[in-house]
C-alpha cells in the first residue's frame, strides 16, 4: 500500500466566475470507490476543499499544464524575475522532442511532473495502456526526491480505474482548486480578473497553462495579487510535504 497520506474530498471546482459547480456523477463515484480501495492514497480533487490536504499554511502553488512549448523559456524568465518557483505538468511526447526545455525548467528551480505521454484522457486507456503512459513520461523527467511521484490527468478526467492504476504505480493524482481560465481567456486582463473575483485561499493549487502568451502577460499581476493576500508561492510538492 502507498505511504500514509491524507485524502482530498472536494466535490466542487472554483473557477473564473467564483462559483462552484458539482462534479459529474462519474467523478463522484470514482472518488468514493478510490476512497474505499485506497484510503491512504492522496488525491487532490478539483475544488476549494483541496486545501484540506495542504500541510503548509499560508502557501499557494502555481501549476502549469501542457508544456514544454516554444514559450517555456519566456515563462521561466518571468518567473525568475518574480522570484517564484512553480510546478510544471509536462506532456511526455513534448519532453521527448525537447529535452532541453525540460532541463531549463529544472535548472530554474521548478518542479516537473507528468501530464500523460500523449495528452489523451486517462479514462480512455486500459490499465496496461495507462501504466505505459505514466512510466514513459516518468522516464523523461528527473527523479523526484519523494516517496510518490505527482501526475495530473489531462483535462482533469479521472475514473476509479485510472486513480487506482496511478496509485498502484506510485503516483499521486493532483488536480487543482482554482482555475485561472487562461486557456479560454480573451486577454491577460480576463485572467487577472479571475484572481480579484475569486481570491485565493491558503493551500490553493492554481491551474495555468503553457503556450498562452496572455498568461505570460498576466503572471506579474497574478503573482502580485497572491502576495498581496499574504501568500507565499511554492511548488505543489512543497504544498503537500
Write out the residue ranges for each language-model feature.
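Membrane-proximal basic amphipathic "stem/tether" segments
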Residues: 1-46
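Residue-level detector of anion-binding/catalytic polar loops
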Residues: 85, 111, 172, 179, ...
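C-terminal domain-boundary segment and adjacent tail
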Residues: 42-55, 82-83, 95-96, 214-241
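Histidine-centered catalytic micro-motifs
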Residues: 112-118, 156, 208-211
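Short, acidic/turn-prone active-site loops that include or flank metal/cofactor-
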Residues: 90-94, 118, 177-183, 238-239
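Alpha-helical scaffold elements lining the catalytic groove of polysaccharide deacetylases
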Residues: 120-147, 155-202, 214-221
Amino acid at each position: 500500500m502507498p505511504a500514509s497520506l491524507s485524502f482530498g474530498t472536494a466535490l466542487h471546482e472554483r473557477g473564473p466566475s467564483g462559483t462552484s459547480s458539482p462534479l459529474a456523477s462519474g467523478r463522484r463515484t470514482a472518488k468514493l470507490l478510490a476512497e474505499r480501495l485506497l484510503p491512504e492514497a492522496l488525491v487532490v480533487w478539483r475544488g476549494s476543499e483541496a486545501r484540506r490536504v495542504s500541510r503548509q499554511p499560508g502557501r499557494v502553488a502555481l501549476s502549469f499544464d501542457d508544456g514544454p512549448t516554444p514559450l517555456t523559456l519566456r515563462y521561466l524568465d518571468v518567473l525568475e524575475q518574480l522570484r517564484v518557483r512553480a510546478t510544471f505538468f509536462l506532456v511526455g511526447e513534448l519532453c521527448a522532442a525537447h529535452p532541453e526545455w525540460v532541463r531549463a525548467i529544472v535548472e530554474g528551480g521548478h518542479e516537473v511532473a507528468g501530464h500523460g505521454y500523449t495528452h489523451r484522457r486517462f479514462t480512455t486507456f486500459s490499465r496496461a495502456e495507462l501504466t505505459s503512459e505514466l512510466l514513459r513520461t516518468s522516464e523523461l523527467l528527473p527523479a523526484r526526491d519523494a516517496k510518490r511521484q505527482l501526475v495530473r490527468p489531462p483535462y482533469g478526467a479521472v475514473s476509479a480505474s485510472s486513480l487506482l492504476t496511478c496509485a498502484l504505480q506510485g503516483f499521486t493524482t493532483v488536480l487543482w482548486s482554482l482555475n485561472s481560465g487562461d486557456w479560454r481567456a480573451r486577454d491577460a486582463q480576463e485572467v487577472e480578473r479571475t484572481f480579484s473575483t475569486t481570491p485565493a485561499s491558503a493551500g490553493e493549487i492554481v491551474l495555468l497553462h503553457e503556450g498562452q502568451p496572455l498568461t505570460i502577460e498576466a503572471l506579474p499581476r497574478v503573482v502580485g495579487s497572491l502576495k498581496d493576500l499574504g501568500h507565499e508561492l511554492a511548488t505543489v510538492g512543497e504544498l503537500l510535504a
